[in-house]
Design a protein with these regions (language model features):
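Multi-pass alpha-helical transmembrane bundle typical of ion/small-solute transporters
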Residues: 1-242
Length: 242
């Protein structure tokens, strides 16, 4: 849906908190690098190239998280104690989340299955699911904190709707991490990985529902701000001839 009113950015420069967060994101991505050394043989080159797809998958996941984080600080520019605390926990979880994410990608690309013990899949999906849920629930908590500060931030009706959308979006995405770790311990462990594809469902429904609310709010705001057009003036009376 075309947006008639854009979300106002309250941050006009990069804060120390956001700069520090970017450094942590960059460090986390450096841990995903396929190899720190250039291949010295044809065999090493092939091994390095086999790691490109898992790296690309992990890189894409981190870009999604980084973009969500960047948009949050750009829009709200909140640097109070609760936001700093939530951001610190998020960065810690991301650093811990790096290696399970990388190993999960390698397993999915058939590079690490030989090293996976019989009960290893249960442990792997549990660790990955917890990390996945925590990342998106922490983002949801950060958006919820911004929504609690809506009066102080002077969020208009459209911005409040969009903030609630981000809360619900991150909450529902995080639920799939919990659903995955429950499935891997159920009689249907084979669906523990495929369940993540169902993220497309809330990613479709939530923007549709809140998009309609946003459109209605935009129309109300535009109607309220539109200048009143003067009504048709009464015709002047002609002087009477008598």
């Amino acid at each position: 849906m075309a947006r008639l009113i854009e979300f106002r950015n309250r941050a006009h420069e990069v804060s120390r908190l956001e700069a520090f967060s970017d450094v942590v994101f960059g460090f986390a991505m450096s841990l995903l690098v396929v190899s720190l050394e250039a291949p010295k043989s044809y065999h090493e080159l092939l091994e390095t190239l086999r790691g490109v797809l898992p790296f690309a998958f992990c890189f894409f996941i981190f870009i999604i998280i980084w973009f969500e984080h960047h948009a949050l600080f750009k829009r709200y520019a909140l640097h109070d104690t609760p936001m700093i605390a939530l951001n610190t926990v998020l960065l810690f979880v991301i650093l811990v989340y790096v290696y399970p994410l990388k190993y999960m990608a390698q397993v999915a690309m058939h590079r690490a299955r030989a090293d996976l013990p019989r009960d290893g899949a249960v442990v792997l999906f549990t660790i990955y699911g917890i990390g996945f849920a925590l990342v998106f629930w922490l983002l949801a908590a950060m958006y919820a904190h911004a929504y609690r500060r809506r009066e102080r931030l002077a969020l208009n009706e459209v911005e409040r709707i969009e903030t609630r959308e981000r809360i619900y979006d991150n909450l529902f995405v995080g639920l799939f991490g919990v659903l995955s770790l429950l499935l891997v311990r159920s009689p249907w462990p084979q669906f523990a990985g495929f369940v993540y594809f169902l993220i497309a469902v809330p990613k479709t429904i939530i923007p549709t529902v809140f998009g309609r609310k946003r459109t209605a709010a935009e129309r109300r705001m535009l109607a309220a701000s539109a200048p009143e057009l003067p009504g048709p003036s009464a015709p002047e009376e002609s002087p009477a001839h008598g």
